[in-house]
Structures are given as structure tokens and as C-alpha cells.
Curated annotation (Swiss-Prot):
Pathway info: Slime biogenesis; slime polysaccharide biosynthesis
Biological classification of the source: Bacteria, Pseudomonadati, Pseudomonadota, Gammaproteobacteria, Enterobacterales
Domain of life: Bacteria
NCBIfam families: wcaE
Organism, as annotated: Escherichia coli (strain K12)
Gene from which the chain derives: wcaE
Segments forming a coiled coil: none
BP-aspect Gene Ontology terms: colanic acid biosynthetic process; lipopolysaccharide biosynthetic process; slime layer polysaccharide biosynthetic process
GO molecular function: fucosyltransferase activity
Keyword rRNA-binding found: no
Transferase among keywords: yes
Keyword tags: Lipopolysaccharide biosynthesis, Transferase
Protein name: Putative colanic acid biosynthesis glycosyl transferase WcaE
Pfam families according to UniProt: Glycos_transf_2
Amino acid sequence: MLLSIITVAFRNLEGIVKTHASLAHLAQVEDISFEWIVVDGGSNDGTREYLENLNGIFNLRFVSEPDNGIYDAMNKGIAMAQGKFALFLNSGDIFHQNAANFVRKLKMQKDNVMITGDALLDFGDGHKIKRSAKPGWYIYHSLPASHQAIFFPVSGLKKWRYDLEYKVSSDYALAAKMYKAGYAFKKLNGLVSEFSMGGVSTTNNMELCADAKKVQRQILHVPGFWAELSWHLRQRTTSKTKALYNKV
């Protein structure tokens, strides 16, 4: 089974180097096969040259050209993917050191489910919090797992892809569309990835809440009262996360 690892980057050579290094332990496992797809937004910081010098290690394929933002870049990665499942590890995100044990289990899974695992959220200064994957019904409030810990069936990604209408929650919208189309969530035990906090979902919580509410109403068709309750719960959670990030 081939796993597609898709990395989106823009002017973050340090992050690309970090993500690349985390793939090494997977490559050492004989029964794991993967490709690394990097979509760079035309950076001028040496990212392209670094990738060229890797000479295709880890079945690397990449493009370096302007795009219309992170979700447009992710769609480019989907178009290039040839695996059964795909995981999005953007520049600076890394596989957990024990992720090989999790990845091995994928070859026994059917490609009509979204596989979820746990992730470590890095707030800096050694402060990390584990986010455990939740049951599939949690999609009616939010993603059941961190985006960096969801293995999407590539066949499903090629049908739906990321909707650029959703500025900060297109990952939630995509998972919701696939869920409504019959792709269930299946939780497997184990840590998949680690990633640093401080992205759009951490710093722009008001836009995140509004975007997520639109997903709930337009895609998941949840009742208005539930969408309102979810909005308040999300706002409280994201505010706490933002405060913790700023404190650390």
C-alpha cells in the first residue's frame, strides 16, 4: 500500500527540513511504502533548491509556483497523489517517532473510511498537549481529530477536494462532505504527528468559528440551535487555546 504524504509550504525552508527529517524512520521500515509530495508557493528562500538537491528521496515529487493559498496548494497535492491514503503534513509538521506502528495498520483498512489518530500540539518551550481522536459523530461540532492526524482516502479527495470558499475551515468542510457522502471515521490507537500551534486556526478564532458554523448549516445541515451552541463552545475552546499559545 502506498501512502501519499502531502506537504504545503511557503517561505519556510526550516519547516521543510524539519518535516523531511521526520520521514526518515518511516523509510527504514520495510513494509511501509510512501511518496512525499511538496507543493511550494514559489518561495525564494532556497526551498526549491533544497528539494532539488534531495534527488527524489522518499519518492519525492514537488512543484514550486504561485498559488491561491494553502487550500489551493493542497488541491495541487491531491492531483499529484497516487497513494491509497493521504496525510497532510505541512512544512514544520512532523511524524511522531512512533508513527510507523500506526501507518502499518493502514494497509488493512478499506479506502471508504477516514482513519483518525492522535496528535501532539506543541505550544513551545517544551509544552505539548495530546489531542486524542474523538468518535465520528463529533464531526457535527468539529473535526474528530487534528487535520494532521487524519488519513483521507485519495479516491475521496479526488472527488471533493478543498473548497476555497471556506477561508480557514476548508479542512472541516472537506471532511464533512466526505462524511455525508458515506465515508465514515475510523479511529485507530496511536500518535500520528506533532505540530506547532500558532496557525490561522489558533490566531483567528472569530473567523474560524464563523466558517465552521457555515459548514454545519450548509453541509451537515444541523439545526440552528445546535449550530449556535457549537459556535459558543468553539469560541470558548479556541479562545483558551489562543490564550495558552500567547502565554507560552
